[in-house]
Amino acid sequence: DAHAQEAGRFSSEAFGGERPYTIYFSKRVNRATASGESVPRYEGLVDSLDYEAELGVILGRDAKGVSKENAGAYIFGYTIINDISARNLQTRHKQWYLGKSLDGFTPMGPCIVTADEIGDEQALDISCTVNGELRQSSNTRFMIQTVCGAIAELSEGMTLAAGTIIATGTPAGVGLGMKPPTFLQHGDKIVCSIEKIGSL
């Protein structure tokens, strides 16, 4: 309890106010959910299920101390990730990990497109529909941090192994941000799409 209190004071000082640096966090993936598969509801545990369309970056080589200028050489390819999130668990535990890491919470696909086929990864349209209604519509040029910038920052003090997948964040339009908040219901069909990759 005492450590929780002192950590709380530190968190308020360290994480409050403006955020000049990118926020990174881990997401456990027991098994990626294939395109077309259902996402589990977890009745009784999850009451606010949400979607997040994101560009996924797959590394093809171990990366350590990589510069932003050279980071592109470490990218094998790209895919689409729907970063399914249980908002009530995020709120309850005051962090992202558990609410994003339940089994089945990482739909990924429908394929991997190699980096040479994508070209400029910072110029891709990204969208998400729920039951045909457009909820998210943006472009990767609006990302807070570039793909290469994220690889450079993350590899400063740790090795990113070949095969590492980086989800690069989601644009506005998630259910949590709607007024009133509108979360996923049983039977909803979510389609995440990214230019040059396809739809998940």
Task: Annotate the PLM regions.
Residues 1-134, 185:
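Active-site microenvironments in enzyme catalytic cores
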